[in-house]
Amino acid sequence: MVTAEMVKELRERTGAGMMECKKALTEANGDMEKAIEILRERGLAAAAKKAGRIAAEGVVDAYIHGDGRIGVLVEINTETDFAAKNEDFRTFVKDIAMHIAASKPEYISRDEVPAERVEKEKEILRAQALNEGKPEKIVEKMVEGRLEKFYKEICLLEQPFIKDPDKTVQQLLNEKIAIIGENINIRRFVRFERGEGIQKKEENFAEEVMKQING
């Protein structure tokens, strides 16, 4: 059975349209990797088609919030130096750095989240569901659903893009790969926040970054 979540995942991984993704998954009997192959054969999977190509060029860029309270360093790679100088790519890098400043991701993708952290989160979510009086037979489904939300909060590629929340960072990345015509890889980032770890008044940094973007 092909679910909406499967269609969404395939779309995020390939950049193909919703209907094309649904057709490919149906044809592949729900096999994600086979569906990607089908889309590639049809020339519809721009991001997946380029994903295996080495991206060793690119840039390291920085974003400093206006008053110096937040700083981000990010490395994003392309296949060629020519693409790295592309204005659309440069704008993308700046946007990603701003997004990181505002949304505080901890990892690039869910593959980077340590297994022990995932297990600990599952234990917490399971305890929460049981404390809510939910029947044990549906607790595991609830845990899986809430775990997806957890990934969306801490993984950069799964977060709603700060400047256009209707798309994820992964979808934005897929769009740029299709436009620029090269593989693009968000390799690593580090986010600094002044006074981090020191008890202080809570600030809405996402709101402040958006004000600066729109200002």
From Swiss-Prot:
Record localization: Cytoplasm
Any one annotated GO CC term: cytoplasm
Any Pfam family the entry gives: EF_TS
Molecular function terms from GO: translation elongation factor activity
Region (Involved in Mg(2+) ion dislocation from EF-Tu): 80-83
Family: Belongs to the EF-Ts family.
Function statement: Associates with the EF-Tu.GDP complex and induces the exchange of GDP to GTP. It remains bound to the aminoacyl-tRNA.EF-Tu.GTP complex up to the GTP hydrolysis stage on the ribosome.
UniProt-recorded name of the protein: Elongation factor Ts
Source species: Acetivibrio thermocellus (strain ATCC 27405 / DSM 1237 / JCM 9322 / NBRC 103400 / NCIMB 10682 / NRRL B-4536 / VPI 7372) (Clostridium thermocellum)
